[in-house]
Amino acid sequence: DWSSDVCSSDLIAFGMMANLMNIATNTQACLVEKMYGRNIMSSFHGLWSLGGFSGGIIGAIFANTLLPIDVHFGTILALSILIIAVGFRFLINDAMAKAEEEDVPKFSFKTIDPILFLLGLMGFAGMFCEGTVYDWSSVYFSSVVKPDEAFIRAGYVAGMGAMTLGRFMADGFVTKYGPARVLKVCGGLILGGLWLAAALPYLIPATLGFLLVGFGISSSVPICYSIAGKLGTIKASIAITIVSSISFFGFLVGPPVIGWLAEATGLRIAISIAACLGLMIAFVAAKVGKRLS
């Protein structure tokens, strides 16, 4: 009926606007990082993770109060407008952005830097595994690990908590060890974490496995965005558009692909296969390490 059509249209528009805001926000973050003179991109993504936690808590509060959904949505809309209105005046304006990128060559598909596609590939792998934790960790615990009801979401909480903490820690590691080394460690943590959870489907090792995955996925995407924005061969906004578009495709296809693999082979084998994406991150980072520094 018309209400479902309107809702579908609204969700499509919401998704498009959310992605545009993602690109704009990360472009601003790259420009701030350049001006700041040190690695801070992962901390920005850490605040995004805190926003997700806050949204979940607020949603749970509204659900428990049984208030109408229009009150819920209206309150969030008003809060969002307030935050945007306050933050807007602190944004880097177009003139400042152009000054920062005045020496950047004009964009051309013929001269596009191949490293952007490799960064996108690593971002794709990271977001594929992030989507797996979001959508399948609780299913894995309920159907494979089978702990007490109170611990069904242990893997999800461990993974998301580690991802948030890891993002606030990552900038210091990138500064000290370089982005290539950190990406290789991230890939190893994803690989080892998912294999641990698949090999030992018991409460403690499976929870530890998803904890390691959370630390692994925490920094992979922010580092890729940061490198893309600082390449100097292309405008930061265009670089992040390319990398984020490839990356978010992993978030889109990851959960259904895991579902298809789980139906065909079982969930333990499915997440074991997904773990190989961590190996891919480490391999690509090792191959192009000099370009990432």
Question: Which sequence ranges carry the predicted segments?
Answer:
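Intracellular juxtamembrane helix-capping segments at the cytosolic ends
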Residues: 19-34, 219-232
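Short amphipathic helix-loop junctions that connect adjacent transmembrane helices
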Residues: 135-151
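Symmetry-related core transmembrane helices of the 12-TM Major Facilitator Superfamily/SLC fold
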Residues: 70-89, 269-287
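Loop-to-transmembrane helix entry
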Residues: 42-44, 146-159, 238-242
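Helix-to-loop junctions at the C-terminal end of transmembrane segments
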Residues: 63, 166-179, 262-263
